[in-house]
Amino acid sequence: YLTLAMGKTDRKEFVPILLKDLPTSFGDNQLTLIHALGLLRDERATGPLIELADAPDARTRLEVIISLGNISSNKAVPVMEKALHDNEPNVRWDAAIGLAKMGNNSGSDLLLNLMSRDYLKRYDEVDLEERTETILIAIQAASYLNDVRLYNKIRELSQNDPVLKVRDEAQKALDLLL
């Protein structure tokens, strides 16, 4: 709990303390350290996190990609682009979202998929509420990019999605893009 609390403080002096424990941590402790470093958004964590990006455990890879996306360092772009091809869908999806927030469109095909209810239905573990939340996040991420395909998909969602919250978020994104 202390580790997570450090991450939520936005106090950069905790970064060296967290980084010191990262190499010797494992399991849930390591995941919490990675998460806390991502919350602090300090570039000093980029290198050590990159070293964990190829971890055999999908949960570790996912947490690393989310944290690297939060930090938004250009040094992480190659690792995040590689993660677009990870065998774990959540890793791919979060890589696309993180890259988009950095203005990198290499995951735009995945963002298009994430804004498609038909695509998300292929994943049984993603329930209706999670589909809606995923679409909302993808809309927000896509709004960082200047991509006509994403724009057209957002426009389509603003007019036709069955969920009012999605239509509203899509319209807000369109207003920002215009």
Language model regions located:
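Structural detector for internal amphipathic alpha-helices that build alpha-solenoid repeat scaffolds
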Residues: Y1-K12, I17-P23, D28-E43, G47-D54, ...
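Active/binding-pocket-proximal capping segment
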Residues: D86, K101, N113-L114
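Intrinsically disordered, low-complexity segments enriched in Gly and acidic/Ser/Thr residues
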Residues: L110-N113, R117, K121-E129
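TPR/TPR-like (Sel1-like) alpha-helical repeat modules
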Residues: M115-R117, N152-N160
